[in-house]
Amino acid sequence: MLSPKRTKYRKAHKGRIHGLAKGGTTLNFGAFGLKALEPERVTARQIEASRRAITRAMKRAGRVWIRIFPDLPVSTKPAEVRMGSGKGSPEYWVARVKPGRILFEIEGVPPELARQALALGAAKLPIKTKFVTRIGEA
């Protein structure tokens, strides 16, 4: 699963996801992509599950690019622990995704297979998404 090799700080604030994506909104690598339509935190597990579903649907033909990276640690406290006594330890990593962000890109497969593969990948994600194509494709 994806996670940073090293970070400046061990724990991070929760924060909020405001506004639309500034960068990463256009297809840069592949011919087809999956675009986020709502703000959400996507975990490394969800990204990996989606990637596996896409590559399996493509029967390992073509190429897949992951355009988001989980760089935010999420900390949790153990079950049945009283409030207070500090913040919990980091448990997993998430990527903050804003609307308009391209999540995955693929190429090297027919348009109908690309649509089907990205639909299977989108089912593994906690957000509404949209299938996008490069101008002139399909």
Curated annotation (Swiss-Prot):
Keyword list, A-Z: Ribonucleoprotein, Ribosomal protein, RNA-binding, rRNA-binding, tRNA-binding
Ribonucleoprotein recorded as keyword: yes
For this protein, the record's CDD domains field holds: Ribosomal_L16_L10e
For molecular function, the Gene Ontology terms on record are: rRNA binding; structural constituent of ribosome; tRNA binding
| Key word Lyase present | no
Biological processes per GO annotation:
translation
Name the Pfam families for this protein.
Ribosomal_L16 (PF00252)
| Recorded GO CC terms | cytosolic large ribosomal subunit
Checking PROSITE patterns in the record gives: RIBOSOMAL_L16_1 (PS00586), RIBOSOMAL_L16_2 (PS00701)
Summarize subunit and interaction data from the UniProt record for this chain.
Part of the 50S ribosomal subunit.
Q: What is this protein for, i.e. what is its function?
A: Binds 23S rRNA and is also seen to make contacts with the A and possibly P site tRNAs.
Family the UniProt entry places it in:
Belongs to the universal ribosomal protein uL16 family.
Name of protein? Large ribosomal subunit protein uL16
